[in-house]
Regions:
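Short, solvent-exposed loop/turn segments at secondary-structure junctions
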Residues: 11-14, 34-35, 70-72, 96-98, ...
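Conserved donor-nucleotide/metal-binding helix-loop-beta segment in metal-dependent transferases, i.e.
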Residues: 72-114
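Short active-site loop/helix that positions an aromatic residue
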Residues: 54, 77-81, 196-197
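Short beta-strand-to-loop acidic/aromatic patch adjacent to the donor-nucleotide binding site
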Residues: 61-70
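Catalytic core and acceptor-binding pocket of nucleotide-sugar-dependent glycosyltransferases
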Residues: 120-228
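Short acidic (Asp/Glu) patches
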Residues: 46-51, 78, 140-146
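A short acidic (Asp/Glu
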Residues: 16-19, 74-78, 216-217
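N-terminal anchoring/stem segment of glycosyltransferases
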Residues: 1-62, 184-188, 199-202, 227-228
């Protein structure tokens, strides 16, 4: 067994999983075929494994989570050695995304709410399905963050790829808090990670480049085949 693993988590046929190959790395896909779903919401069923590798991958020191529609095209050993050298967690920054740069969960929340309201005018028959998540939960969550002093413009992750030394104490504590936010708040995990990192004083790194356009990962277009 390797000390390093690449894994993904797909429930409800949302992603057409891309086959992976990376020398020296074990591979795993969590799904309803390997683990019984607990929640009616496939998104949360998948994100439990995404967020909590310390519960399910204890025998590994390093993990790289990737969305099911992502493929590895670069040297992961090089990536992990670079970004987990002085921290136990690393993400791509949403602010480096060419198409939709944002640097704040509050901005992300407002974008989701604005898009939902726009869609509601265009297709009112879809009702709340016009929103990526329950707008009440999103607003409630952002209000809570503001009330406890979480600052604006404090960074925003993209959750497509996560590098972790997942058995380390600071990582475990932050991931458990992150899962609590996703479980009881919005399922949009980008809204809550930076808050949890701030709350736990977690040091983490941002990888260079656009999460959709970089030398290590490729995102397959049209790979989403189901509903979260």
């Amino acid at each position: 067994m390797s000390e390093r693993i690449i894994y993904t988590s797909v429930f409800g046929g949302y992603d057409n999983v891309v086959e992976q190959s990376s020398d020296g790395w074990d591979l795993k896909c969590f799904s309803e075929e390997t683990h019984m779903p607990i929640y009616e919401d496939n998104n949360r069923n998948a994100k439990k494994f995404k967020v909590l590798p310390h519960r399910y991958l204890k025998d590994y020191e390093y993990s790289v989570f990737i969305d099911g529609n992502m493929s590895v095209v670069g040297n992961l050993d090089e990536l992990v050695d670079k970004y987990l050298k002085d921290s136990n967690v690393a993400f791509f920054s949403h602010n480096n995304n060419y198409l939709d740069a944002r640097n704040c969960p509050y901005q992300e929340a407002q974008t989701i709410l604005d898009l939902g309201a726009k869609n509601m005018k265009l297709t009112p028959e879809r009702g709340m399905l016009n929103y990526k998540d329950d707008p009440y939960l999103i607003q409630k969550q952002m209000t809570k963050y503001s009330m406890v002093g979480f600052p604006k413009d404090n960074g925003l992750i993209t959750g497509m790829v996560i590098l972790r030394r997942h058995n380390e104490k600071d990582c475990i504590e932050t991931m458990e808090d992150w899962w609590t936010e996703i479980k009881y708040g919005s399922k949009r995990d980008q809204l809550s990670f930076n808050y949890c990192a701030w709350k736990n004083n977690l040091k983490f790194n941002y990888m260079d480049g656009d999460s959709r356009d970089n030398e290590y990962f490729n995102r397959s277009t049209g790979a989403h085949i189901g509903k979260k």
